[in-house]
Structures are given as C-alpha cells and as structure tokens.
Amino acid sequence: MAPASRLLALWALAAVALPGSGAEGDGGWRPGGPGAVAEEERCTVERRADLTYAEFVQQYAFVRPVILQGLTDNSRFRALCSRDRLLASFGDRVVRLSTANTYSYHKVDLPFQEYVEQLLHPQDPTSLGNDTLYFFGDNNFTEWASLFRHYSPPPFGLLGTAPAYSFGIAGAGSGVPFHWHGPGYSEVIYGRKRWFLYPPEKTPEFHPNKTTLAWLRDTYPALPPSARPLECTIRAGEVLYFPDRWWHATLNLDTSVFISTFLG
C-alpha cells in the first residue's frame, strides 16, 4: 500500500476512538491510543541532538529545516498541559478558534472547555478547511500567563527578531494546509504532528480551502519523487525549525498539544 493510502486507512480507525483519560504519561489526550494515525517512516528532515548555535546559523537558519532534540527541558510545561490541568485552570476562559485553511479569516470565540469536550474530535476527511475550527494562535497571553511562563523556547534566536508564542490543541487528522510566513520553531508537547515543507521557490500544488488530509489523499500519491516535499513526523519533546518563507502544511496524527515560537 502506498504511504499516503496507508496513513489514510489507519486514520479511519481514529474516528471510532473512544474518549478517556488514556495511559499514564499521555496527559489524558490519548496520543498513540486506539485508532491514532500510523506514523509514516519516511523522514527527509535532519535530526540534531548536539547542534551548536554556530552550526545552526551556518547550516540551517537561512537554508533548510532541522529537527532539534534535547536542547530544552519542558517537562514542567508538559505536566501543566495535561487535559485535566488545562481544563481546571482555563476551562471557563474564552479562546479564539480559527478555520483550518490557508488564510484562516473566520474566527469563533467560545469557552476552552466547550472546545475540548465538544469540538476536539478526529477530522472528517470530507470537511473543508474553512469549515473546520482549530485552536492555534490568537492566544490571550495575559489570561494564560501562568502557563506560558513555564515554557522554555529553543535557545537559538536570529538577529533582529523577537520571539512570539502560539499555543494550540487539535484533533487527530486535523492540520493546516500549505502556507508560509517568517521563521520559527514548533514543539510537540503531546501527540505527533507530521510536517510537509517546500522551499520558497517551489510552490506546492494545493487548494487553500482543502485540508491537509484531503491533499494527502488526492495530491500527494501522484507526486513524482522530484516534486515531493521534505517531510517528517515530530514527536513529543522534539522541535522543528523552519526558515523564512518556507511553505509548510501540518497533519496531527493524534490529538496533539503543541506550541510554536515565531521569530518576527
């Protein structure tokens, strides 16, 4: 079975996964639980566990993505991001949801608990991105300060930029289709997130209102090897760096908790 077909077939099981607290260590989000999307073995993004700042600037910062391992310890932040703790601390706080399409024009405000308990479910593969609500970005840093102050961002900055956080939680099979912006990092706290990346000069073939899941089903299988993106699955505790203006799309293989650090 082709890689994309295998991912989609295994995703289908996610739609019948039962709610629950999950095994110890999953924070109650059930990553890797029954029906989670299988992790595709193909990875064309380099992983580095011993990267120095000089190497980062010379080899990656302006050139290509890289996956960073072991540079920070966010175990405290991870513990605070368990399902029960987030609901206890922020359940009644209003959060702003965006549509999971390229431009994300439409916004919806509702209590965080309502999002987690009623909207956080596996992606319907027939839904359009502009019909799918997604909690990512638009964070209220005043109301959520007690959480964000415990996060340790990647230590490598870029001259003339300042970091800005964007925190999110999304269901299995969800994601954002191809788009680009400035450089940044994305760390998975719980779950797994698959990334697809193209350099600025190589515009991918995609529809801005179709989901990444639809792109994986309809477009990815027909791509010749020379037209395939860089891709890899980022697991809990790993950080992906993407350079300025690189096209990227994401697919959450589990219900995933994640945080990005944009360098603006």
UniProtKB/Swiss-Prot annotation:
* Record flagged with keyword Transmembrane helix: no
Gene Ontology MF term list: cis-regulatory region sequence-specific DNA binding
Q: Where in the cell is it found?
A: Endoplasmic reticulum lumen; Cytoplasm
| Keyword Nucleus on entry | no
Explain the post-translational modification.
Answer: N-glycosylated.
Glycosylation site positions: N130, N140, N209
Q: Which keywords does this chain's UniProt record carry?
A: Cytoplasm, Endoplasmic reticulum, Glycoprotein, Signal
Q: Which InterPro entries match?
A: Cupin_8, JmjC_dom, JMJD6_ArgDemeth/LysHydrox
- Tree of life domain: Eukaryota
Q: What is its main location?
A: endoplasmic reticulum
Per its UniProt record, what Pfam families does this chain match? Cupin_8
Q: Where does the signal peptide begin and end?
A: 1-23
Q: Which GO terms describe its biological process?
A: positive regulation of canonical NF-kappaB signal transduction; positive regulation of sprouting angiogenesis; regulation of glycolytic process; regulation of pyruvate kinase activity
Q: Which residues form the JmjC domain?
A: 131-264
For this record, an example GO cellular component is: cytoplasm
Q: How does it assemble?
A: Oligomer. Dimer. Interacts with PKM; regulates angiogenesis and metabolism.
> Its function?
Functions as a positive regulator of TNF-induced NF-kappa-B signaling. Regulates angiogenesis and cellular metabolism through interaction with PKM.
Full protein name: JmjC domain-containing protein 8
**Organism in which the protein naturally occurs:** Homo sapiens (Human)
| GN (gene name) | JMJD8
